[in-house]
From Swiss-Prot:
It comes from the Eukaryota. This is Cellulose synthase-like protein H1. InterPro entries: Cellulose_synth, Nucleotide-diphossugar_trans. The active site is at D137, D459. Its EC number is 2.4.1.-. It is a multi-pass membrane protein. The gene is CSLH1. The keyword Hydrolase does not apply. One of its GO terms (biological process) is plant-type primary cell wall biogenesis.
Length: 750
């Protein structure tokens, strides 16, 4: 039993959310889908396009069942950090991980602001109980230099935040606006002005730094970066701030820079490999029982976030109920009406809370607090600690480092020392050993231990492994939000991110980690399995949605119909389904405080994403499975400004769709062009029917189908006539035209 749960005052409460009306709506739409399928079967004409429609609609029905399961029983968790007051001395240590991979796509100032917000957290004895580790997979001296400068700045920034109760402790965000000063705020005004000046100096030092100069004039501090290549270098670990008692007492958390060893002969497993290296390095330096991981662009927005997390990690009667605490991804400076459909507000409130009511929310890769022993692969139940007693068993799981095996045994059996390490610099040499690129060979790292390898979405796969071991997880929603980041803007960044996620999901779906197999042979609950499938089938939706989208143009071009005509009873089923589904989606957005425009933007982006990012992800993974290609981890550019008053005239107009020469735009551009051509040809046929009395094939349903696609693909159609970054490149246009020509030829021959 957790120590905190034995107290008189509760730390958390699980609150079910009633949704009776929504359940009725779920069932009503399911009934209409089944009725449409029944109509198809009873009125089967044998036409291939109608049977294709039946197959697609059967898939949509299956997708709706998964959606209903995910939303059926939502919950929220309320936390009461004020009740931790009587247990201050019992609060455990936390190791905080920040990952960055590319100093160009993820500028050092972005990472610096995230780190500074972590160093300024409100937590008892933060200097002793918190430690911040930064993984730099780019092995950049610029990143290391920026973090060293950040540590110096933190000596004044952290006391300023605590003295004045600063709410948002990422300097770029805090200084983006000027607070209102009163007559009695003289001291605060003086401090604020000084800190703003110091931050501007920090920004200039980091932005003016260049790699050759650092290597030449760094006084030997950056000698380890000489002659290194990004994918071929030894381990570099630097203790940038060691807050031991002999020097400063209770100041701010330790700060450690880590760039793990890489070799071109060994796979480094992207972010999952970096997280596993950080886990081992931190185990030998501070070995906190809990870990927080953040992407480099997700800064702390609520300085009490660790206290809230402890309410969940310590507040249940047993540990099984909370293996990890996931916070929702929130975005600052979000564009009005969510033009790119990537703010995920409704998905969180509807699907996220629903999954939280099952075995628990998914691990989303950032903003998550973990139990270290769960990451080490510990199972639930009586057999949880078996396999950790002998040195041979520990070696097969964790590797050859005796120091690490001893630290792992301490975590698993709860034998952690309450005395802080006096000098973590003395641990650097042994820490380098476990960050070596060949350390994991012959061990369980990446499989049963640590972050799981084998998918571009290593985070979700790792969470599934934890759930499969019998653990549960919790969703932590607090005000103000725990962490904030910046959502990708423009077309390329959004679609690149979605393609990466979809590729990772499909890799899991067709692998031995498939949740159906995990439910059959392990402890993943059935409804949790369906919840995972709800996400994993994202890319599988693409061929079905593409097929259904092509049926409208095909029928208009070949004078056929695939939807019931107005004279058929099935027309009213299809019409009722169309109205019910769109009304359902609209009401979801309204209930979540979103606008009608936001609802339309999200629906539009789903159609664009399905015909672009998801489709390309589907094809990429299929080709990889057949041995024709490899999936590649693509880092999403971080677009946020990190200096006060920064204005970049090269940035695109907010909310406007931008394009590049990525192949992701080819199929969706072709589909947009095809829909317009089909409507034009269909309208011409209507004129012939009216004037010459020719028999007509397609009905109004096919026109509505194509017209709806035209509305959804309007950003692409505008891109066809746009210029610069707002115009679709000619190479994409020509390839799209070729696809359209092939489809027109197909329609003519059929």
């Amino acid at each position: 039993m957790e120590a905190a749960a034995r107290g008189n005052k509760k730390l958390q409460e699980r609150v079910p959310i009633r949704r009776t009306a929504w359940r009725l709506a779920d069932l009503a739409i399911l009934f209409l889908l089944l009725a449409l399928l029944l109509h198809r079967v009873l009125h089967d004409s044998g036409a291939p396009w109608r049977r294709a429609a039946l197959a697609c609609e059967a898939w949509f029905t299956f997708m709706w069942l998964l959606n209903v399961n995910a939303k059926w029983s939502p919950v929220r968790f309320d936390t009461f950090p004020e009740n931790l007051a009587e247990r201050i001395d019992e609060l455990p240590a936390v190791d905080m991980f920040v990952t960055t991979a590319d100093p160009v796509l993820e500028p050092p100032l972005v990472t610096v602001n995230t780190v500074l917000s972590l160093l300024a957290l409100d937590y008892p004895a933060a200097g002793e109980k918190l430690a911040c580790y930064v993984s730099d997979d780019g092995c950049s001296p610029l990143t290391c230099y920026a973090l060293r400068e950040a540590a110096r700045f933190a000596r004044t920034w952290v006391p300023f935040c605590r003295r004045h109760g600063v709410a948002v402790r990422a300097p770029f965000r805090y200084f983006s606006s000027t607070p209102e000063f009163g007559p009695a705020d003289g001291k605060f005004l003086e401090d604020w002005t000084f800190m703003k000046s110091e931050y501007e100096k920090l920004v200039h030092r980091i932005e003016d730094a260049d790699e050759p100069s650092l290597l030449r004039h760094g006084g030997g501090e950056f000698a380890e970066f000489l002659d290194v290549e990004r994918g071929n270098h030894p381990t570099i670990i630097k203790v940038l701030w060691d807050n031991n008692r002999s020097r400063t007492g209770d100041g701010f958390p330790r700060l450690i820079y880590v760039s793990r060893e890489k070799s071109p002969n060994l796979h480094h497993h992207y972010k999952a490999g970096a997280m596993n290296a950080l886990t081992r390095v931190s185990a030998l330096m501070t070995n906190a029982p809990f870990m927080l991981n953040l992407d480099c662009d997700m800064f702390v927005n609520n300085p009490r976030v660790v206290l809230h997390a402890m309410c969940l990690l310590l507040g249940f009667d047993d540990e099984i109920s909370c293996a990890f605490v996931q916070t929702p991804q929130k975005f600052y400076g979000a564009l009005k009406d969510d033009p790119f459909g990537n703010q995920l507000e409704v998905s969180l409130m509807k699907v996220g809370r629903g999954i939280a009511g099952l075995q628990g929310i998914f691990y989303c890769g950032t903003g998550c607090f973990h139990r270290r022993k769960v990451i080490y692969g510990m199972r639930t139940g009586r057999e949880g600690t078996t396999g950790y007693s002998s040195n041979k068993e520990l070696h097969s799981k964790f590797g050859s480092s005796n120091n690490f095996k001893e630290s792992a045994r301490d975590v698993i059996y709860g034998n952690l020392s309450t005395e802080p390490i006096v000098d973590i610099s003395s641990c650097v040499d042994v820490a380098k050993e476990v960050a070596a690129c060949n350390y994991e060979i012959g061990t369980c790292w990446g499989q049963e231990v640590g972050w799981v390898y084998g998918s571009l979405t290593e985070d979700v796969l790792t969470g599934q492994r934890i759930h499969a071991a019998g653990w549960r997880s919790t969703l932590m929603e607090i005000e103000p939000p725990a962490f904030m980041g910046c959502a990708p803007n423009g077309g390329p960044a959004c679609l690149t991110q979605l393609k990466r996620w979809a590729s990772g999901f499909l890799e899991i779906l067709i692998s031995r980690n498939n949740p159906i197999l995990t439910t059959t042979f392990k402890s993943l609950q059935f409804r949790q399995c369906l919840a995972y499938l709800h996400s994993y089938v994202w890319p599988v939706r693409a061929p079905f949605e593409l097929c259904y989208a092509l049926l409208g143009p095909y029928c208009l071009l070949s004078n056929q119909s695939f939807l019931p005509k107005t004279s058929e009873d099935g027309f009213y089923i299809a019409l009722a389904l169309f109205i019910a589904y769109n009304t359902y989606m609209f009401m979801e957005f309204i209930e979540c405080g979103q606008s009608a425009r936001a609802c339309w933007n999200n629906h539009r982006m789903q159609r664009i994403t399905s015909a672009s990012a998801w489709l390309l992800a589907f094809l990429t993974v299929i080709l990889k499975t057949l041995g024709f290609s490899e999936t590649v981890f693509e880092v999403t550019r971080k677009d946020k400004s990190t200096s006060d008053g920064d204005s970049n005239t090269d940035e695109p107009e907010p909310g406007r769709f931008t394009f590049d020469e990525s192949t992701v735009f080819i199929p969706v551009t072709a589909l947009a062009m095809l829909s317009v051509i089909a409507i034009a040809v269909g309208a011409w046929r209507v004129v012939l029917v009216t004037t010459e009395g020719l028999p007509g094939g397609p009905g109004i349903s096919e026109f509505i189908s194509c017209g709806w696609l035209v509305l959804c693909f309007m950003p692409l159609l505008r891109g066809l006539v746009g210029s610069g970054r707002y115009g679709i490149p000619w190479s994409i246009k020509m390839k799209a035209c070729l696809l359209v020509a092939i489809f027109l030829l197909f329609c003519k021959r059929n």
